Amino acid sequence: MAEVTDDEWKDLLNLIRKLEMCLKSVFSADLCNWSCLMNSFFKEPEPCPHLHIHVRPRYRNPVVINGNTYSDDSFGHHYSTKKSAPISIEDMQAVFIRMKSWLNS
């Protein structure tokens, strides 16, 4: 991460702000956890490390998508890397469409 230029940091900050606003506006996320895990690249015989960032929106209250309720049972704590219940393809598509609509507005 130390190799990221000042201009790249500014661009990244703008993307982070926009994505957080989207998640808070569209799904009422209370906050977002961000992570950058570089060690996975070194599992390969010829690693090609690059900046790879994950965002995990966190929710105090359940979120309803297409009538299905999703709860963040570990809100306020570290989350497990194991998914307790996968999101359906239909709900995943609804999330994508709603976020895309907000980001393009």
Question: Where on the chain are the PLM-derived regions?
Answer:
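HIT superfamily nucleotide-processing domains
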Residues: 1-105
